[in-house]
Amino acid sequence: MKFVDEAIIRVEAGNGGSGCVSFRREKYVPDGGPDGGDGGDGGSVYLQADENLNTLITYQFERFHIAERGKNGRGRDCTGHGGEDLILKVPVGTRAIDNDTEESLGDLTTHGQKLLVAKGGFHGLGNTRFKSSTNRAPRQKTLGTDGEVRSLKLELLLLADVGLLGMPNAGKSTFIRSVSKAKPKVADYPFTTLVPNLGVVNPRPGQSFVIADIPGLIEGAADGAGLGVQFLKHLERCRVLLHILDVEPIDGSDPVEAARAIVAELEKHSPKLAGKPRWLVINKADLMLPEELQERIDRIVKELEWEGDIYTISAYNREGTAELALKLLDFIDSLPPEEEVDADAEVEFKWDNYHQNANDSINEDFNDDFDDDFDEDDYDVEIIYQR
């Protein structure tokens, strides 16, 4: 199935049902009071994470999603039926963003987690709500409020512990093949990797972590050049980044300049991402003699002023990859657990005080001198019509 990690949809919550104006009229009860029921609340729209999904391609073809409207109230104090909530299934790792305000509404990072993205309208009030000692036959009601409407941008961010960075043909896909059972395409030309790849690494029995490989970055990527920039967001949830550096580039370029370009693009795209723990991994060590290799590594470390972790591997021959995987596992285990998120996140809704405000505004209009236009039986007085 085609990998789609971004989609824009429009969600509309259901409107609230209106209240009803009705009076009790039964045999032997000629002067029954008001019995108009309230309307029903409109259905809300939720996103729910589903581990069985891995792409947002469905929402590229289904862009409009509308929840059910609440039913109107009826006589005999019958409350209208509430609208059914609409639940949209999305892959685990999906982030919801308001496309108009750029506000992040929340992330869905665990299976079954729900996120409220559009709240249904509140129900209107029936005339029973407005009866009082001075207004015994009220003909007032309130309408249901409109449901919330949002334009949503859905972004799928892969859930991985380790992210791979590097220029095209640095050996990222070869590395992920050497430490996991993932089989991304490998070839001797740039941009062989066109979409992110995930691999599960098992350095020890019963212990594992997930590694993510994205298309290679080039200079100017933060401004839209190449393919990697649109996939950098997939590294935001990674706990450590591996900067794969080709020690002997096939085009004869300087590894130091390549490393600086990657760091510059990372900082330009997201300072937060650039601040994550980053290990330097020198790849293709089998292409050089040991003495030349050590001289090259010393120069790289000196010119980059690198003070962090550095490892030398040959992903093609699987030299040093197992040891690196073990060190990654130990490092990830030593990190503090990530903060838990609420299972049911909510967003602000502008109608939270609607009912109270509606009651207050209408009741302020009633006083002892109030005279309804239709006041035949306001005071339980029987009106007899004669020809």
Curated annotation (Swiss-Prot):
Entry cofactors: Mg(2+)
GO CC, alphabetical: cytoplasm
Binding of GTP, residues: 166-173, 191-195, 213-216, 283-286, 314-316
Keyword Mitochondrion: no
SUPFAM superfamilies xref list: Obg GTP-binding protein N-terminal domain, P-loop containing nucleoside triphosphate hydrolases
Assembly, per entry: Monomer.
Protein name: GTPase Obg
